[in-house]
Amino acid sequence: MISKTTPPVIESGRLRLRSLTVADLPMTLAWRNQDAIRKWFFHSEIISPEQHRAWFESYQEKDNDFVFVIEEKRVLQRAVGQVSLYNIDWEKKRAEFGRLMIGDSEARGLGLAQEATRILIEFAERELGLREIYLEVYADNLPAIAVYRACDFSIAKTQGGVLYMVCGSDALGASGEFE
């Protein structure tokens, strides 16, 4: 099992995913509050530094919520975004994927969101033994949907302008329905 006291570092050819730290909060808050990014979050209001810090303190206490900072290692050589696995149900071996954003404007359009998604899903399946990863995305967020489809997510259902997508060996569970 993964823990915040011994967080993993996940690497691919050009990316490193490392755990979010308190030092990252100003950067991630600035990314999250960009109009072009926050419009895709279900809670799309501007977040204050105090709200972000309070969220982080609560996050630190959870053993089923892991935020990773995406670092590009070759060209930009800096943090460029974030991605998360959360609502992890260790018993059912499933988790929610999300909070994906490429906040650094120079890093957009380079395929980093797709690569980060792919390596985090592979880590979740291989190292954590998760059999199902699911997410929710606005049906009109076509760039995100393209990333998710390229990483083997499929649409389980659509409701109220939101797609529910799943991937993994137990993607639709025994009942064949999205929970």
Residue ranges and their predicted role:
Residues 1-53, 171-179:
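A short, well-structured alpha-helix characteristic of acyl/acetyltransferase catalytic modules
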Residues 19, 87-89, 157:
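Short, low-complexity Ser/Thr-rich regulatory SLiMs
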Residues 44-105:
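Acetyl-CoA-dependent GNAT
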Residues 77, 111, 141:
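Conserved G/P- and acidic residue-centered "switch" motifs that form tight phosphate/ATP-binding loops
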Residues 109-123, 146-150:
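Conserved acetyl-CoA-binding loop-helix of GNAT-fold acetyltransferases
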Residues 131-134, 138-140, 150-179:
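C-terminal "cap" of GNAT-fold acetyltransferases
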